[in-house]
Amino acid sequence: MSAQDFLVELGTEELPPKTLVSLADAFLAGIEKGLSGAGLTYSAKQVYAAPRRLAVLITALATQQPDRSVNLDGPPRQAAFDADGNPTQAALGFAKKCGVDLSEIDQSGPKLRYSQTILGKPTTSLLPTIVEDSLNDLPIAKRMRWGARKEEFVRPTQWLVMLFGDQVVDCTILAQSAGRHSRGHRFHHPQDVRISSPAGYLSDLRAAHVLADFNERRQIISKRVDELATQQEGTAIVPPSLLDEVAGLVEWPVPLVCSFEERFLEVPQEALITTMQDNQKYFCLLDAEGKLLPRFITVANIESKDPAQIVAGNEKVVRPRLTDAEFFFKQDKKQKLETFNDRLKNVVFQAQLGSVFDKAERVSKLAAYIAPRIGGDAQRAARAGLLSKCDLSSEMVGEFPEMQGIAGYYYAKADGEPEDVALALNEQYMPRGAGAELPTTLTGAAVAIADKLDTLVGIFGIGMLPTGSKDPYALRRAALGILRILIEKKLDLNLVETVKFAVTQFGAKIKPAGLAEQVLDFIFDRLRARYEDEGVDVAVYLSVRALQPASALDFDQRVQAVQAFRKLPQAAALAAVNKRVSNLLSKAEGSIAQTVEPKYFDNANEFSLYSAIQQADHAVQPMAAERQYSESLARLAMLREPVDAFFEAVMVNAEDANVRANRYALLSRLRGLFLGVADISLLG
């Protein structure tokens, strides 16, 4: 079957840069779906996106649908004809439905059947609907109308190119009649651009100063920004999201170096970086020590004959932004950080839980409780907790919300607070996302855990549990943050006692009955997803969860040990034995004796297992004390042979009550050894 290349380009006013890639990808996906549904084959696909256009190129697209054979089954033969062989209404109705005479219906089988061949339609007749459906299905949060037209799209449309081979596909979509003329760069080439063929699309636009390939523009910007940064003896800060956004703003990227006055460097560099990145879409430069340089890179959308004019314009625009940041910083520093707490008494944290100041006081007490239990200083943690929310009422954070915690750090430093106290004001929000940085100080870790735990206990205490996708207080993230800090920083904190202490801080504001258990279950349940992401089988998690360790670090150490144990050749058999023993013990009548009496042994294999258990117990006790769980399970794996021999030769439920009870006690000792690490019966 013959094939031709197909190109569709929709020209628009400037598209939202942050959603440009997702719109383009959805456009391609919609066209792929339409082609697949129509049975049209092709060899390759490519999507293009620029500020004023979305385009899709399909290579070697079939020029026509394949013919299709369709079989329609009708009524059973005995229902289609009466005793005299005359057609019934069922037969006549089926023929009418098929649009043919009854004589054209196949009557040889058990049912009447009509077979027909549906000729494939020309691809050109199908493309308009496929393209239109794809555009209508784009994930556009809010569509707009323009002029007096009824059509709706994310931005007003300007032109439409649709070529199949070298021929225009005749159609009108979103108020635009298809043609072969695109448009060049708004300034360098404002005239129409004739697209010679689908394959020539990129080169035709390149000649008109338009780089239609988003990835090409992104690579050019990234490479040139790095080159310019090196020339300035610095390193560019290039967040992927900012790079994507800038690539979505320009058709012909030209990065240029600009500068600002060095006096602005007295302002916290995070504030300067925030305003330059978020408001101006600039790439900031750092020196070898990570300090902000008084220079930045802007990406122009024009190759100017006088670049200095563009540089001067950007420097003029950024100056008021930096001046604002400087003003807020100086205003805030006119008073001590602690005095900002008074303003927080009138700021509601949560209606039932009090003000932000109330929260800061609770965090202070809880951090002081946590700090010495993880090796930190209670007084410094209490101080950091008390100051933790002060900067929320500062001018700086009011203008730049991203500066919360960071501003507090700088103001605390200026007030002469200890370094770890100042750092804790920023570290309280860590980790700020999945895989993000953790606190570096014990004071910061204590405040971070306290802040998150206070939120968890408080919100759970008033019954506002997260449901489905709704988690307005980010409780899942808070729980995961606590776990990451404790596990990755190797902090051995008893969460059971800590949560109970946190509950006492709220007084009558919450309902304490069963609250601590509910919060603990929520926190430890988050570990399940964490381990699944790491490739740990859920059975391993459940085997440790059954023991309900109080420490997240201890929990993790047990999980790692069980994970290693599962790789041992004896693991499966011992897991099965533990399951068997668990079932036997659960059915035992009365209480099981705590001690084993060798005098009741009547089989050599009982003596062998008892001796092996005694030796194993003696070996693993010091391991358990040091939480050497992997070593402990490896030692217990040596019990497989005496255990197997025992079950092969010994009937546990002996007729003699004393012998039977003694065997239950022996098996209880065996199971107890493994339960020192995990319930491995759940691994089977």
Swiss-Prot record:
GO biological process, one term: glycyl-tRNA aminoacylation
SUPFAM superfamilies linked to this entry: HD-domain/PDEase-like
Disulphide-bonded residues: none
UniProt keyword list: Aminoacyl-tRNA synthetase, ATP-binding, Cytoplasm, Ligase, Nucleotide-binding, Protein biosynthesis
Assembly notes: Tetramer of two alpha and two beta subunits.
Reactions catalysed according to its record: tRNA(Gly) + glycine + ATP = glycyl-tRNA(Gly) + AMP + diphosphate
A single Gene Ontology CC term: cytosol
Family, similarity comment: Belongs to the class-II aminoacyl-tRNA synthetase family.
Entry keyword annotation includes Nucleotide-binding: yes
Protein name: Glycine--tRNA ligase beta subunit
Enzyme Commission identifier(s): 6.1.1.14
Compartments where located: Cytoplasm
Gene Ontology MF term list: arginine-tRNA ligase activity; ATP binding; glycine-tRNA ligase activity
InterPro entries: DALR_anticod-bd, Gly-tRNA-synth_bsu, Gly-tRNA-synth_heterodimer
Pfam families: DALR_1, tRNA_synt_2f
Claim: Kinase is one of the keywords in the record: no
Enzyme class, spelled out: ligase
